């Protein structure tokens, strides 16, 4: 299914997704409490996000597999100017019973660049240099979530997106479903009532909007 701000692909090969889930089990020993806010300033806020996650380098074969479908979806639906997976890493996320992630955006106003200038001071050249050295000319444009668990393996845990009219879209729970959406779209993972929900999520960056 393709909309202006969201794209679902439910036709990824089951045998590849099954192999991916098995191969990623080596990362289970590295799971930590998920944080909100991102970067070095991320904090654990279980009233907002209660889950476990770790990071997968984009040198892992799963990243190349996912990137193929990201490019396919972008070509067929978004046509955004994109470059790569942010930070050269993907997030391996696990939700157990009672865990969830409330409504949020992957690119909100708080995520935009703020020059390091003291109040009352203005140094355009310094600002420009700081802007470039921090690589802030790239921003999140697309987000993706690949479902590794089958819908029969857990209850609840629906992935949902919210449009500007307040309408909620619920993504399929089928294993191998790739959900690709505009990083500015509000989304959530509802509370898992039973079982375990596993996924790979990541963010696709590109030149800042003009």
Model feature map: region roles:
Residues 1-178, 184-210:
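Fe(II)/2-oxoglutarate oxygenase catalytic core
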């Amino acid at each position: 299914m393709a909309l202006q701000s969201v794209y679902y692909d439910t036709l990824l090969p089951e045998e590849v997704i099954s192999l991916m889930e098995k191969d990623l089990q080596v990362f289970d020993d590295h799971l930590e409490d998920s944080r909100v806010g991102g970067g070095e300033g991320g904090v654990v806020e279980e009233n907002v996000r209660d889950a476990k996650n770790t990071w997968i380098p984009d040198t892992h074969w799963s990243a190349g597999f996912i990137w193929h479908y990201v490019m396919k979806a972008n070509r067929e639906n978004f046509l955004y100017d994109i470059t790569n997976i942010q930070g050269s890493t993907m997030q391996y996320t696990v939700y157990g019973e009672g865990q969830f992630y409330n409504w949020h955006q992957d690119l909100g106003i708080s995520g935009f660049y703020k020059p390091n200038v003291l109040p009352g001071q203005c140094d355009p050249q310094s600002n420009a240099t700081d802007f470039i050295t921090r690589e802030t000319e790239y921003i999140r444009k697309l987000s993706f979530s690949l479902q590794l668990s089958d819908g029969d393996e857990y209850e609840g845990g629906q992935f949902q997106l919210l449009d500007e009219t307040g309408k909620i879209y619920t993504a399929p729970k089928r294993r191998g479903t790739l959900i690709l959406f505009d990083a500015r779209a509000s989304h959530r993972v509802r509370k898992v009532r039973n079982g375990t929900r596993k996924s790979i999520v990541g963010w696709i960056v590109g030149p800042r909007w003009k």
